[in-house]
Every structure is written in C-alpha cells, then in structure tokens.
C-alpha cells in the first residue's frame, strides 16, 4: 500500500499535537495518510507502553489514517544510528510516501530534534539503490517540519478550522496523558493537563491569525516555494 503522506514522530501523541488537523484534512481530501511513531513513550511519567499503543490506535482512527505503525525504538535514547535509519528507511520504501512530516530540527526534547535528523537521513538513504536494505529504492519528494514545538516562524500554515474539534478529540484520546486518574496527577510534567485545552486553542489561533483564519497548523520547509500565479496568491498582505 502506498501513502501520499507519512508523519514521523518520536512519541505517540506528537503527530496529533503538531499536525493532527492537517492529517485529518488531507485524509478527507482523499489522500492516503499514515503515521510512524518511533517509540512507545515508555519513559514518560504517565501510562504504560501498552496503554499508549491502544490510545494511539484510537487516535489514528479519529485522524482517518490508513496505517499507523510503531517501530518500538527506545524512548529517550534515540540516536542517528545506522540501525535506526535503516528501520525508518525500510518503512519509507514500503509505503513510498510523496510527502513526509517530521518534527522541527531544534527544540527542548532531545527525541524531537533527533527524530528530525534521523527521519531526514532515513528518507535520503531510502533512495540509494545500493543501500543495504530490502525493497526498491525510493525517496520522498517533499519534507515538511511541524513548527508547533519550536519558537519559529512557519513557512506556511494549513487552515484546520473545520477540523479543529476532531483534532481535539484525537488528542484527548490519550487519556493516560491528558485525563489521568486522580491518583496519577501528583507529578507535573511539561505537557499540560488542565491547561491543555487553552494551550491547544492559543497555538492554533496563533497560526490561524497569520493566515487570516480561526485555527491553523504551521510548517517549515527548507526550499523556496514556487508559484505560477502571483495574482491569485492566498493570504492578504494588509
């Protein structure tokens, strides 16, 4: 099965938080989408690996993805190794996605910026004919970096106003992370609990204001954008 869009992230729930609305929008547009979670988030404060896999499966259904896979790499121990690159490259060759979404290449969490480099290099080596890996050589056409976890101005933003509520439901499918039992609420971590709804809204509204819509998700690309019609370009200048 070939995919049009594959989102790669270090932990279950990262895709939902950074590009969930975009995944929903692309699936509704008829594109075949998928998610590759690199780890099970087993070193996190809340939940078990099995619980998070179950939550990821539920969230994936809400997002409408055709496939969701977990590589089971060690959480908090990601590195740009040949072994990990080959594991991701094998998935790239299997699904042949035209577009890949990666985390932004800078950030607070080592797994996030490591996943960005790891994903990029895996996409590259997947296209090397003589690389020691099963399958036919294939390299994605476009790589996007989700801007949500980084203090960076996005290259472009995707209007997710019509998909915001469904994205919200996908995020809240991670009950162990965002709606834990009271007995598990003693420890505080960076990901919000009571403040989650407000933070989700503020961030989506922030990107939305940039393009004149209610809610949006931001992305960064390293290449210059091409346009063939400067008269009908979107987003007002004033």
Can you annotate each of these PLM segments?
Residues 1-95, 220, 232-235:
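Active-site rim/loop-helix segments in enzyme catalytic domains that contact anionic ligands
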Residues 2-6, 80-238:
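Metal-dependent de-N-acetylase/amidase catalytic core
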